[in-house]
Amino acid sequence: MDEQALMGLNPNADACYRQRALAYFEQLKASLDGWEVCAEALAKGVYSDDHVKFFCFQVLEHQIKFRHGSLSAAQQQLIRETLMKWLQTQLMNVHPEKPFIRNKAAQVFALTFVMEYLTLWPKFFFDVLALVGLNPNGVDIYLRTLMAIDAEVVDRDILHSPEETRRNTLIKDGMREQCIPALVESWFQILQTYQHTHSELTCQCLEVVGAFVSWIDLNLIANDRFVNLLLSHMSMEELREAACDCLFEIVNKGMDPVDKTKLVESLCQVLQSAGFFNVEQEEDVDFLAKFSRLVNGMGQSLVLSWTKLSKTADEKISAETLRAVESKVPLMLQLLIHEDDDISANIVCFCYDYLHVLKQLPALNEQQKSNVEAIMLAVMSKLKYDDEYNFENEGEDEAMFVEYRKQLKMLLDRLAQVSPELLLEAVHRVFNATMQSWQTLQFMEVEVSIRLLYMLGEALPASHGAHFSGDSAKTSTLQAMMRTLVSCGVSEYQHSSVTLEFFETVVRYDKFFLVEPQHIPAVLMAFLDHRGLRHSSPKVRSRVAYLFSRFIKTLHKHMNAFIEDILSRIQDLLELAPPENGFPALLSSDDQLFMFETAGVLIVNGESPAERKQGLMRGLLSPLMEAFRMLLEKLPLEPDEERQTALADCLSHAVGFASRTSKAFSNKQTVKQCGCSEVYLDCLQTFLPALSCPVQRGALRSAVRSFLHRMIICLEEEVLPFIPAASQHMLKDCEARDLQEFIPLISQITAKFKNQVSPFLQEIFMPLVMSIFEVLSRPAEENDQTAALEKQMLRRSYFSFIQTIASSSSSQVMASQGAENIERVLFTIIQGAVDFPDPVAQKTCFIILSRLVELWGGKDGLVGFPDFIYKHIIPACFMAPLKTTFDLSDAQTVLTLSECSLTLHMIHLKRGPECLQFLQEYLPSLHVSPEITQELCQVLQQPDVKVLKNYMKVFFQQAKL
């Protein structure tokens, strides 16, 4: 072997040696007999270096995986001998190989087994077992090989081809017939021999039993001698977790429901008499987590058996199975309520399934009601935070608790389905008791009682949040709890989790305040003072900003008396935070968006006259405009790029805030009706100069463009005078992304104002198109994926724009561009339909072509256009689908073909027999037979276009064969 290349296998070797090792590896893989050197090295133990041994196994693995079929019988025999010789040397080694080498060897053994067991090496296991006996090094390789075989043949998480699946089924059938009893016997001997002396091997063997039990005869394992051995392992500290996992796999095996019930019951009996059900006496939480998983598996298996049996006529067996399920409930409850959340989480699924069983019963007996109540109390208790939860810096443990809480919420929702009255009553009881003495309780007690009230909102659903109408028992209880919540003073509790839960609950049940509006002032104060928007925690302030906006939106009709008071109290939260003051603002700019929207909602929905609304809106937006002007003056003079970015961000925020206030307007309350047009027009005039700012163009243009989108909706025609100048600036020195984002603005204007904007569109059409052509023609580096994607998106936007123009009543805009320009645009559409393998763009292009044929393809159409139809559009309808990139198995491409068919249909509608005549001359040039040509022409004359669509699909499928 190339010794110098082998030096490069060491992870600490120089890069040049590593490169050489890699090249050598590729060389040996490619060589027909290079692997034999590696086989010899392994068989004779030539190398002591671990990395070289691993390398040799990798080369061997490649041969078996990819070349096995082409090896001669002698070469295949050499592989078998190599593996067995290597295994023999392991038996004599004082120190076993490193685990990574043993794992790789096991993979190679498993691959050889998979390739040869059915044909060349049916005695694989007998040979291996005869060689290794009970030698610990040999047993280790044997067990690792079995796990590697499980991964290759059984593991359901690995995707196999149909051929591999067939092969794997044959292997399992062969093993069941020939060697499984011998393997099971070997496992028993290994477990018995090493249980006291070699815990690692014993655990490995238990893992093998667990892996294989799913597809072998269960009687080989579920018998007295094997189960007693497993149960004895449950009492050994180093083996008990692995034994638990093994029993879990046995219980999980698919089988007849009656047999499954018997198996689980006998197992439970033995576990119970061995004292395992005395959970409170067990201190090892890792074992208990495994035991909880086992009990969960047993419980779910029994529920599944009951579900199957309850559908049969045998009520006696079904009732027995239900009793078996119920007898596990006390143990389930002990595990569910355990202080360790992992132990509790592992039993949740059985608990959930048990509640599902109760939900299906016609009525609950006293014991079942008692069980429901016990589960309810357990869930309520386990929902509590513990002392260690870090609210300021949530890490992995906190994330796990949040997930666990979600599981408990599922249980609570299921409890509500089983017994809504019981849940409501229990929550009411806990809630009232807590609220009466919240001042003296720990935060987790207070938080969970409010949380339970919050969770009722989903557990007892009401359409559109109408929790306070309908069923009087429910509404009066909820109403009473809400009344207590907002009047008992708990919003003053000094813990962020309680504060947040208070506001979340107030907003979830915001419709309560429509029924009892007298509580609104108290809750408003909580939102506005140190409990809410002025809270010491940024996390609380941020969430409250969002919740406050939701609260105001729902209750805006009840806010009239408080509007100006609220606006004055939040005034400092509506200030644009200047980038240079260095002080952290109370709210982030994202939070401020909600505050501006809230202010807008208050002003717009107030009952004051339009004049007052205008005054308030001006008061809200004028400070933004002033700050904007000042910052915009500073920006071009700022030399430091970081400061430039900060200024541009600040300017963008100002525009975003102004834009967000406009969300308050509606069809009932338009900008005009509220007398606010002038204020927003002033904003427009203030913001538009940012478009000509020579620095930070991307950010500023994006912000102003978004504002224009909003103003087109809000100000309607009043915005039109500003569009030409704005467009001119946005088309200057632009990048692909600028254009791509600008086009929807023009499309929006076109679609909304139609003929009104025709003169403007005629003026801007070619400059816009030329800008697009120029950006698309810029050279980009071959591997620059971002640039390629941006160009693709721009191309799509361009075609969408042409589609908007063609589809609207502004189609004259194109017709008036002059023959040369029209031709240029038309060629880009043909190119888009045929040359770019982008079905989204192609589909749009065919829609455009179809529309243009409809507009200009008739007798009074555009001069020269019929000629264009025959020279370019009809050929495009055939050339595009014939491209190799046109994939007819792709749904998006099929839609493109559909539009292509509609284009042909439209041409025939407009040109009649002339079109058919052309096809009869054109199609033979594509090697289409006269019969098929005739057939296509007949289909084209059918009135139902579906026939044509289906025909075209078959036509191109045949053409591509």
From Swiss-Prot:
It is found in: Cytoplasm; Nucleus. Pfam families: Exportin-T, Xpo1. Gene3D superfamilies: Leucine-rich Repeat Variant. GO terms for molecular function: small GTPase binding; tRNA binding. Keywords: Cytoplasm, Nucleus, RNA-binding, Transport, tRNA-binding. GO terms for biological process: tRNA re-export from nucleus. InterPro entries: ARM-like, ARM-type_fold, Exportin-1/Importin-b-like, Exportin-T_C, XPOT. GO terms for cellular component: cytoplasm; nuclear matrix; nuclear pore. Mediates the nuclear export of aminoacylated tRNAs. Belongs to the exportin family. This is Exportin-T. It comes from Danio rerio (Zebrafish).
